[in-house]
Amino acid sequence: FSTVFSFLKTIKPFIRLGYKEFSQEKSAFNSAMSYMLKKAVNSNGTEITIDFNRALVSMGTLMPVFNGTATLCKGQMLFNWYNNSGIGNAENADMAMLLVYNKDKEIAIYNTEAALRSDGYAELPLPNDWYDDELITYLSFRSVDGNSVANSIRLSVSIMEEITGDTEKREVIALVPSEKLFSFQHLNIASPIVAHILSVFYDEDRLCESRPPT
């Protein structure tokens, strides 16, 4: 109980919006607590841990997005998603809600009006000392009036490394104009070659921009 309570307390303002649709009979916080305890915890008989894959930091009837990416680069988390406006009740003007939870430090950073659904991208600045920590990321949406909220989705985090040196193995993530994610994972080639491959899609100075080039 205390584990879930501590997690939700850390993101209480986010939960207040994220569970607004369920705040008529009981508080948004209590609604989130109820869901988490029923659906998003693991227990070995003596210890309870949160299943962050099943956890929902928002829940509601608004159409969510079903795929997206989260990329850590130069002190910020870059979020990209497919704009599914027009499907169900999803609208271009829906507001993106971003959340990054630092599991090691047990603190969170979030933005409940980071971008429009139609933007397809947003960024969230992070503290410099978070780079080596385990980060949990969630993406959700709410309607303009805030009355409808989507179920959140957890995004796995990719790390975009600097393209420097001559022979190191790298994992480089490139966000290209098609809004698809291309990953060169642990390539056994020199970094300048990777940089040349990426230059087809991106100027090297723009590798950490979340917005696809036009």
Which residues fall in each region the model found?
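Long, polar/Ser/Thr-enriched low-complexity segments
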Residues: 1-60
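Short intrinsically disordered, low-complexity coil segments enriched in acidic
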Residues: 1-4, 162-167
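Context-gated lysine
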Residues: 9-12, 20, 26, 38-39, ...
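Compositionally biased, intrinsically disordered low-complexity regions enriched in proline and serine
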Residues: 20, 36, 102, 111, ...
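Charged linear interaction tracts used for macromolecular binding and regulation
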Residues: 34-163
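Short, low-complexity, charge-dense intrinsically disordered segments
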Residues: 165-203, 207-210, 214
